[in-house]
Amino acid sequence: ASQKRPSQRHGSKYLATASTMDHARHGFLPRHRDTGILDSIGRFFSSDRGAPKRGSGKDHAARTTHYGSLPQKSGHRPQDENPVVHFFKNIVTPRTPPPSQGKGRGTVLSRFSWGAEGQKPGFGYGGRAADYKSAHKGLKGADAQGTLSRLFKLGGRDSRSGSPMARR
């Protein structure tokens, strides 16, 4: 009996540690994902800002209270926030040079997007759609949906021979 008890205890301890480890792993996985997202956001804004953003709002609040209580750190606070504040100021309230850049980029982006939308999908797909519609009209197609359904029926009968696909 004395030999069985420690084995049972070890088994229960092992199960308990395994379950707690599983819980810890499950608890850490989403946290690591969130920190990864926050780190990526922090790196996007400023590499120095990534470390403070790892902590939750509580960390930030504690740091702000520390900054407020200690005058030395309050002097360092604007230095830490300078790049981010500068970045946001450039975005939110652009001064004389940024608006010209913003306008130029906006027009270029809009032209590029219009060109991409108009030429590649518009002409290419439009031409293809016209070809397909004309070919299907010759085959017996009236609407695009009818041609699509007939295409699926033909494809299902010929290649797959699947009854549900053919019925659709």
Curated annotation (Swiss-Prot):
Positions of post-translational N6-acetyllysine modification: K120
Pfam family, one: Myelin_MBP
Membrane association type: Peripheral membrane protein
Residue numbers spanned by region Disordered: 42-84
Modified sites of kind N-acetylalanine: A1
PTM sites of type Phosphoserine: S7, S12, S19, S40, S56, S74, S113, S159, S163
Subunit note: Homodimer.
Protein name per the record: Myelin basic protein
Organism: Oryctolagus cuniculus
Lineage summary: Eukaryota, Metazoa, Chordata, Craniata, Vertebrata
